[in-house]
Amino acid sequence: MSYDVVIPAAGQGKRMKAGRNKLFIELKGDPVIIHTLRVFDSHRQCDKIILVINEQEREHFQQLLSDYPFQTSIELVAGGDERQHSVYKGLKAVKQEKIVLVHDGARPFIKHEQIDELIAEAEQTGAAILAVPVKDTIKRVQDLQVSETIERSSLWAVQTPQAFRLSLLMKAHAEAERKGFLGTDDASLVEQMEGGSVRVVEGSYTNIKLTTPDDLTSAEAIMESESGNKHV
C-alpha cells in the first residue's frame, strides 16, 4: 500500500546549539534533511512527502529542493507553534484515505525494511510505532536526588516513523485540539482516545534522532559503518 509521509521540520533544535535549524547542518557534505528525504524518495511506496516548515525558512527549503532534485512530490506546508500543531497542518495536506507516516526530519537513518514492517502493521491495526527496548537502567530523579528506580523490562524507547490510518490520526488530532491535550508524540494522541490502541514494531538502535552535538559524532560513525558494509 502506498503512503504519504509528514516530516516536521520547523523546530530550531536548541539542544544542538547550532544557532540555526539543525536540519541544515551538513553530514558528509549534505544537509541532514536531505539525507532524510532521500530515504523516502527512494522508497517505491512513498507517494508524497509533506515537509512542514517555519514559514520564515521557506526560501531556504525551496533552494535546497532546487539544489537536490527529488522524484517524489514534496509539498512545503507552514507549521504551527508546537510540533503537534505542525503535524496536524501537514496531515491536512493528505488528499485521500491512506496510511500516513509521521517522521522526525532529524532521523536520517531509518531503513526501508523498517518502514515496510511498520506499514504492514498499521494496515492491520490502524496505528503502529517503531521502538527499541531500553538498555540502560532508568531512575526517576528530583532535584538531583534519586527517588525511584524504574523496572526497565517493559520500557521501550519510541522512535519514528509512526504509521497510522489517516482517518484515525486526524480524529486523534481533532480530539486532542478540542481537549487542549498536548502529547509528546502522535501515538500518544491515539492512546488518549477511547479504545485507542497502538502496536509496536521493533526498530533499530542506529535510528537515532540528532538532538545534541554528540549525536552528530554518532551519525558520522553510523555513516562510516554503513559505507564500509557496502564494500564488504
Swiss-Prot record:
Query: Which reaction is recorded as catalysed by this protein?
Result: 2-C-methyl-D-erythritol 4-phosphate + CTP + H(+) = 4-CDP-2-C-methyl-D-erythritol + diphosphate
Which PANTHER family does the record cross-reference, listed alphabetically? 2-C-METHYL-D-ERYTHRITOL 4-PHOSPHATE CYTIDYLYLTRANSFERASE, CHLOROPLASTIC
Name of the protein: 2-C-methyl-D-erythritol 4-phosphate cytidylyltransferase
Q: Known NCBIfam families for this protein?
A: ispD (TIGR00453)
Q: Which Pfam families match?
A: IspD (PF01128)
Recorded hits in Gene3D superfamilies, A to Z, give: Spore Coat Polysaccharide Biosynthesis Protein SpsA, Chain A
Whichever gene encodes this chain, its name is: ispD
**The protein's enzyme class:** transferase
Q: Which organism is it from?
A: Bacillus subtilis (strain 168)
Keyword field contains Chaperone? no
Query: What UniProt keywords are attached to this protein's entry?
Result: Isoprene biosynthesis, Nucleotidyltransferase, Transferase
Task: Give the EC number(s) under which this enzyme is classified.
Answer: 2.7.7.60
Q: What protein family does this chain belong to? A: Belongs to the IspD/TarI cytidylyltransferase family. IspD subfamily.
| GO MF annotation: an example | 2-C-methyl-D-erythritol 4-phosphate cytidylyltransferase activity
Give site residues, Transition state stabilizer.
R15, K22
Positions MEP for the nucleophilic attack (site feature) positions? R152, K209
Q: What does this protein do?
A: Catalyzes the formation of 4-diphosphocytidyl-2-C-methyl-D-erythritol from CTP and 2-C-methyl-D-erythritol 4-phosphate (MEP).
